Amino acid sequence: MQRLAKIAVLAASLVLAGCEIARTAEVANANDTARFLAGMQPSADSPLAPLTQDPAWQRHAQFFDSAFAQLEQRQLSRIVAWSQLHLAAPRPTMFYMFSGPDFLYADAFHSRASTYVLAALEPTGPIPDVMKLPAGGIGPLLYYVEHSLSSILSFSFFITKQMKVDLDAGEVSGTLPILYVFLARSGKTIRDVSLIWLDDKGTVHAANEPVPPNAPRGTRITFAASDGAERTLYYVSTDLSNSGLRSSGFLKFCEPLAPGDSLIKSASYLLHVGSFTVMRDWLLANSSTIIQDDSGIPLASYDRRKWRFFPFGRYEGPIDKFPGRYQERYAELFERSQPLDFGIGYRWRSSESNVLLSVRVAPDDMGQMESTAEPVPPSPPRRSRPRLPDMLEPPRYFWFPR
């Protein structure tokens, strides 16, 4: 009897092992993987389809359905409407520096772009392959994805220190899983994904070619929007400081795509400091429009003869994590701002958020250009600054512990 029991256990183990081998031998395409990670049903014939019966995935799907529905109502739909109203002639390319893997807001502000260039320090990571996860690995993977997105779903930005930890955990790591989720939840269909690197001339190479030390690495994703038109997303992991840009071909890669529309938000005020002047000057020279909050390019860096300024919302100064970044000229400019019905940036509440739309003036219009609201020279006496509160936590609707 004991011998029969041992044989039965051995047979069951072999069956389970065979199933695991069969599962890992299958490969899911990028679009199905993105939908699975986003809590959306993959195609019926996908090898990922059976995994959606896992209670962990079903809970994950319910959580993301709720979280993204709230985000769509609270912010994204309003940003899309704002953009369509105020960006009259969008360029084919949009640039989003210091973005992290934030395709979500790149798409909301610039849904009509055909090429997206996102750049930040965070590594791309390998192409996600859920089928290679060990048995029992689905739950931890989905927790990792949710935890990685917690701050941007709440505040509209990634918390850099937290992201460094989140993106280096688990079998599926890096920024690609997050880009996948945002593409799927934005209604996009992924057609192809490849890992790339850039040489010092800005030429794109496949990742399987020999990579020089410190070369910018990233990914190229082709996808279709709801209109069926093919679009391209580049995410490049690179150092955007002066020294980093001077030693890489990243800006040479960007130059043929310019001029474009630029987005800067929650950028840690890096463009205010001397070690990021190369990036700042490049954006000013190669952007047709710039949408930013006050953490982007300081107002004093704009040439008032070349730009028109359209302020929206309310400027209350930086949060207390960034002392010394208050701008008197910005405050004067926003005294004549238009209403803003969505929150963005470090002051994520709509009643405290600011958005500045800067539009480059055509050469023929220079000299007779009149700004909607001109920055005032720093002659008035210094006004008292508003209180700079700590960043407060938003409503908690995440199921995972904090």
What residue ranges belong to the model's regions?
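Non-globular targeting/processing and membrane-anchoring segments
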Residues: 25-151, 222-225, 231-402
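Bacterial N-terminal signal peptides
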Residues: 8-17
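Short, thiol/selenol-centered motifs that function as redox-active sites or metal-ligating centers
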Residues: 99-111, 117-120, 155-180
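Extended amphipathic alpha-helical interaction segments
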Residues: 139-174, 190, 194-200
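Bacterial signal peptide processing site
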Residues: 20-21
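Bacterial N-terminal signal peptides that target proteins for export
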Residues: 1-9
